[in-house]
């Protein structure tokens, strides 16, 4: 049976409220939406409110054949530094069109606006966070790094003093929703790249369809299983997912069919194992961590992620924290023994041989 955890139960409502904030905001009616994903994840994480996104005309581009998120799965992407000779790449247009299109629109933006023409709508800070999330997803798809200069020019623009706030909020969403970590890989030239979190090597993206990374949902489910005593029924998992707007049999705009992910993909990829509950009558089934999850990540890493979702520290879950510490110690000891194995075995063998030599 699943283990009850009072600390987890006490904070569960807080987790629901925070995850419910991760929704899509409608576009302002007076602004043409260039792509259905352009207002993705408009609400911020805890502490921020959602605002309508308004996109200035000189930022609007129709989705092209190279639109967001059509690439295949990648584990540790070999990022490329964008060539400056190609010009700045807009996330909604092909590379061959971007420099020309942006250049023409910048020139148009410098023209004098007649006095009777209203000012162009200005993108809010929330809107720029949304735009940056989409830009990050695009860069992850094409395996390219992002430069501070590109982010400033394409997205932040006149709000230079808000750069770090916009980057931090977008990075938090990438982490909590998509399971991707933003790292500054070149501190001198300020280039950033995206990596799958917690040591995992799966993002669930498919080459033949419009797709988003699924790692965030995988980490969340691994967390539910761990917090429930290292085993959870499907009903217990849906009890956590439903308040977040994720339902069995209902297509989700990020995760697709979540039940298919849970019962097929995550099990097939060996991140989860589906097994009968001992002594259950009628027979019932539960999920546990699969061999790939045990090999790639750890209970401590997952607990730290769960604690961050709660806005707390791993120590507020004492039983899970102690269990995670024990696992860390066991892994460290196993690593030491493995590294010292051959010499240790050799020494033991020599000692045994010496003890069998008859004394004269």
From Swiss-Prot:
- What disulfide bonds does the UniProt entry report for this chain? none
**One annotated GO biological process:** negative regulation of transcription by RNA polymerase II
Origin: domain of life: Eukaryota
Gene Ontology CC entries for this record: nucleus
Q: Where is the composition biased (Low complexity)?
A: 341-360
- Residues forming the MAGE domain are 125-324
Task: Spell out the InterPro entries in the cross-references.
Answer: MAGE (IPR037445), MAGE_WH1 (IPR041898), MAGE_WH2 (IPR041899), MHD_dom (IPR002190)
Question: Where is the region Disordered?
Answer: 1-118, 340-360
Q: Which Pfam families match?
A: MAGE (PF01454)
* Coiled-coil positions: none
Amino acid composition bias (Polar residues), ranges on this chain = 63-98
Residue ranges under compositional bias (Basic and acidic residues)?
Answer: 9-19
Xref: PROSITE patterns: MAGE
Annotated membrane-spanning segments are none
SMART domains listed in its UniProt record: MAGE
Keywords attached to this Swiss-Prot or TrEMBL record, sorted alphabetically, are: Tumor antigen
Instruction: Tell me where the signal peptide lies.
Output: none
The name on file for this protein is Melanoma-associated antigen B16
